[in-house]
Design a protein with these regions (language model features):
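N-terminal chloroplast transit peptides
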Residues: 1-48
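Gly/Ser/Thr-enriched, mixed-charge loops and adjacent short helices
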Residues: 74-83, 180, 199-358
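N-terminal small/polar loop signature for handling phosphorylated ligands or for N-terminal nucleophile
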Residues: 115, 123-201, 267, 309-376
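Buried hydrophobic positions in well-ordered alpha/beta secondary-structure cores of metabolic enzymes
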Residues: 91, 129, 169, 188, ...
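Proline/glycine-rich low-complexity loops and linkers
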Residues: 159-163, 217-267, 378-461
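An N-terminal, well-structured beta->alpha segment
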Residues: 55-150, 175, 180, 256-294, ...
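Conserved phosphate/anionic-ligand binding catalytic regions in large, soluble enzymes, centered on
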Residues: 83-99, 193-195, 298-302, 306, ...
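Phosphate-binding and adjacent anionic-ligand microenvironments
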Residues: 361-363, 367, 376-379, 399-604, ...
Length: 651
């Protein structure tokens, strides 16, 4: 049983007396605001409040600068006891909201994170606190701001209404500069990514470093170690909640001096960066063509805070081309995962669903809850994420100005299909295969070794930031379409998404690919299944004998291992990253336990059949993969171990 913490007697550290003058100045632009805005007090409460409502500190109007002399706070030391299981996964700590709402649960993790960071990244530092807007986010922002103040942080940057996409947070860490020249040293990102949101659903928190990327294992391991021994945390309990619905800077005074909360527009910084990467004028011409139609589904996640500004206001798309682009705490009751199962409305509109009506648009796309994942669709055509990153890499230099001077290298996660490998070989590019988790790409990017990278789990990105970026991927595809059609916008027929993919297969071959997810299975059963797969690798002749009994026509396994990665930049080693069976014809079976779920275990089976013969690249994926699917299910004994006769999701 997880222990609840008993009330503690706090130790209070009082602020040094400091008299401030009342003053009013002229509002300034977001990047050059004075750090000395002051707020007024009024009473209000968070929509998802779980703690006693406190007076809100706020600027009177957007951009207003008001000085107050009495907004001071003290620091309280709260006794606490550890909670079990606060181990950050590949993308932070994800649990049910009700778990995070337990006394001191969030505070324990936040303090453990502060304690794991170098002192200069906390004391006097600037940090970002925002996320995808899911339920409990607004409360979490206030708690973290109070703890940041108590731990000596100089200022906290918050996206308006607590909304910042994960890629936008990365961009802000890397690009935004305060009036006194300070940059953010890191960020608490409040997201459980593609997991559902709401009072009974998931919440998550992860820390990103000063390069804009997720904390490396050396830091997350230290955070986890701290959570197991924590005895106290610091918090400024008398700091008023800040009204995060209004932009402006609110300042306070504490024992270590001034502390600011800067609430700013969620989209401006990100849009400024993205416009330096893509040729917006060429994309506008494509979207203006009467022969081109477009649809974007935000799945009621944070992408909605960017979609209208980018696709409608900047690029001229019709507002009717946007679906579910109002961010909601519960994602409209849906599952904000951009795949063929959960993005049903978009899938139907694109002519791929059972209830599809009317003529589909030429191009469709979706993003997940925190807008770092993406799905790309053509008219009645699905682009696998593995193909997507390979096609972007193959066309980037010609289509995207940011890459005009060439690619430094490309990388993919191990479970992602080898389509990118073939592109890299043909274009003579550096290529890297890394474990699942975007932080592994970050090291390569920081070392100037990688420009474009991707994951089979609908994550694609580049070295413009240190996170995967759903909207970047959509704009990359629009750029490729714009380039392919630049001399044909007035023609009878545009080059389509399907045309581009078919041309790619004709050049590089096709990697038929699918993923079977078995969610929330018994954790012990999952471990036993994986252990048996490792044990089988000791004798490949026996493995091949078993395979021939299942499917005689399937090629022999020529190599099998448990994937291990040695980082070429820092030499760190990551073990137990998935089980691989590699076949003589370039096909693969991969088995992996996922670290992103909040309950139970998720077994993922990746099935890949490579076809070089261009005359055979047009088969139905299910037909081409059927023999290997049969082998994967029977070789792993998935039903025997889990009791499941079918996967939860097939991608």
């Amino acid at each position: 049983m997880i222990p609840l913490c008993a009330p503690s007697t706090p130790a209070i550290i009082a602020p040094r007396p400091r008299r401030l003058r009342h003053r009013t100045t002229t509002p300034s632009p977001p990047h050059s605001r004075s750090p000395h805005h002051r707020g007024h007090l009024h009473l209000a409460s968070s929509s998802s409040s779980t703690h006693r409502p406190r007076p809100l500190a706020r600027a009177q109007r957007p951009g207003a600068v008001v000085t107050a002399a009495d907004m001071v706070f003290s620091v309280t030391k709260r006794d606490t006891t550890p909670y079990e299981g606060q181990k950050p996964g590949t993308s932070g700590l994800r649990k049910k909201v009700t778990v995070f709402q337990q006394p001191h649960y969030l505070a324990n993790f936040v303090q453990s994170t502060f304690n794991a960071l170098p002192a200069d990244q906390v004391k006097g530092a600037t940090i970002v606190v925002s996320g995808d807007g899911r339920y409990f986010s607004k409360d979490a922002v206030q708690i973290i701001a109070k703890m940041a103040a108590a731990n000596g942080v100089r200022r906290v940057w918050v996206g308006q209404d607590s909304l910042l996409s994960t890629p936008a947070v990365s961009a802000i860490i890397r690009e935004r500069i305060s009036a006194d020249g300070a940059k953010a040293t890191g960020a608490f990102i409040l997201t459980a990514s593609h997991n559902p949101g709401g009072p009974t659903e998931d919440f998550g928190i992860k820390y990103n470093m000063e390069n804009g990327g997720p904390a490396p294992e050396s830091v997350t391991d230290k955070i986890f170690s701290n959570t197991k021994t924590i005895t106290e945390y610091l918090i400024a309990e008398d700091l008023p909640d800040v009204d995060i619905s209004v932009t402006g800077v609110t300042s306070f005074t504490g024992p270590e001096g001034p502390f600011d909360v800067d609430v700013f527009d969620s989209a401006t910084d990100y849009i400024k960066l993205i416009k330096t990467i893509f040729d917006f004028e060429s994309i506008k011409k494509l979207l203006a063509s009467p022969k081109f139609s477009f649809c974007f589904d935000g799945l009621h996640g944070v992408a909605g805070a960017y979609a209208k500004r980018i696709f409608v206001d900047e690029l001229g798309a019709s507002e009717s081309s946007l679906l579910n682009c109002v961010p909601k705490e519960d994602f409209g009751g849906g599952h904000p995962d951009p795949n063929l199962t959960y993005a049903k409305e978009l899938v139907d509109r694109m002519g791929l669903g059972k209830t599809s009506n009317g003529e589909p648009p030429e191009f469709g796309a979706a993003a997940d809850g925190d807008a770092d994942r993406n799905m790309v669709l053509g008219k009645r055509f699905f682009v696998t994420p593995s193909d997507s990153v390979a096609i972007i890499a193959a066309n980037a230099v010609q289509s995207i100005p940011y890459f005009a001077s060439g690619l430094k290298g490309v990388a993919r996660s191990m479970p992602t299909s080898a389509a990118l490998d073939v592109v890299a070989k043909n274009l003579n590019l550096k290529f890297f295969e890394v474990p699942t988790g975007w932080k592994f790409f970050g090291n390569l990017m920081d070392a100037g070794m990688c420009s474009v990278c991707g994951e089979e789990s609908f994550g694609t990105g580049s070295d413009h930031i240190r996170e995967k970026d759903g909207i970047w991927a959509v704009l990359a595809w629009l750029s490729i379409l714009a380039y392919k059609n630049k001399d044909n916008l007035g023609g009878d027929k545009l080059v389509t998404v399907e045309d581009i993919v078919l041309q790619h297969w004709g050049t590089y071959g096709r990697h038929y690919y699918t993923r079977y997810d078995y969610e929330n299975v018994d954790a012990e059963a999952a471990k036993e299944l994986m252990a048996n797969l490792v044990k089988m690798q000791a004798s490949l002749p026996d493995v091949n004998k078993s395979i021939k009994e299942i499917q005689p026509a399937v090629a022999d396994v020529v190599s099998a291992d448990e994937f291990e990665y040695k980082d070429p930049v820092d030499g760190s080693v990551s073990k137990h990253q998935g089980i691989r069976y590699l076949f003589g014809d370039g096909s693969r079976l991969v088995f992996r336990l996922s670290g992103t779920g909040s309950v139970g275990a998720t077994i993922r089976i990746y099935i890949e059949q490579y076809e070089k013969d261009s005359s055979k690249t047009g088969r139905e994926s299910s037909d081409a993969l059927s023999p290997l699917v049969d082998v994967a299910l029977k070789l792993s004994k998935i039903q025997e171990y889990t009791g499941r006769s079918a996967p939860t999701v097939i991608t």
